[in-house]
Swiss-Prot record:
GO terms for biological process: dUMP biosynthetic process; dUTP catabolic process. Its cofactor is Mg(2+). This is Deoxyuridine 5'-triphosphate nucleotidohydrolase. HAMAP family: dUTPase_bact. The gene is dut. Its EC number is 3.6.1.23. It comes from Acidiphilium cryptum (strain JF-5). The keyword Hydrolase applies. One of its GO terms (molecular function) is dUTP diphosphatase activity.
């Protein structure tokens, strides 16, 4: 399935290709850094990386901004609010919050594939207030209450 999305290239994004899928089976498009000069992110520091793009999503869709696994594994570069959500009514520039969780400074350069974006449908809920909820085996257990080990059946 393909969905048409209007995209506006901002002045500082000129000369960069539009985000694209790296392979035919890729779920995410690679977002490129539209920085004019290299941005050095120290260990433990964050930076807001521009993409040089603004979009108009169709209603009932969002664009999820996610980390790239290679950057996370090799350099400790993560997106702390992952997945970041670009709402269908947002028209500003797509920017990526990047955190260096690694041990060495990381340099973001122009055109670097800094994150990936996945188009996703959005369902809207309608609250149905009640005095009673159905019972479950788990009940209110959370925050690790199911343990770390996978239960092995006999």
């Amino acid at each position: 399935m393909t969905i048409a999305v209007a995209v506006k290239r901002l002045a500082h994004g000129a000369g960069l290709p539009l985000p694209d899928y790296a392979t035919a089976g890729s779920a995410g498009l690679d977002l490129l850094a539209a920085v004019d000069a290299p941005v050095v992110i120290a260990p433990g520091a964050r930076a807001l990386v521009p993409t040089g793009l603004a979009i108009a999503l169709p209603p009932d869709f969002e664009l999820q901004v996610r980390p790239r696994s290679g950057l996370a594994l090799k350099h400790g570069i993560v997106i702390p609010n992952s997945p970041g959500t670009i709402d269908s009514d947002y028209r500003g520039e797509i920017q990526v919050i990047v955190l260096n969780a690694g041990t060495e400074a990381f340099e973001v350069t122009r055109g670097m594939r800094i994150a990936q974006a996945v188009l996703a449908p959005v369902s809207r809920l309608v609250w149905q207030e009640t005095d009673d909820l159905d019972r479950t085996a788990r009940e209110a257990g959370g925050f690790g209450s199911t343990g770390l080990d996978f239960p092995m059946g006999n």
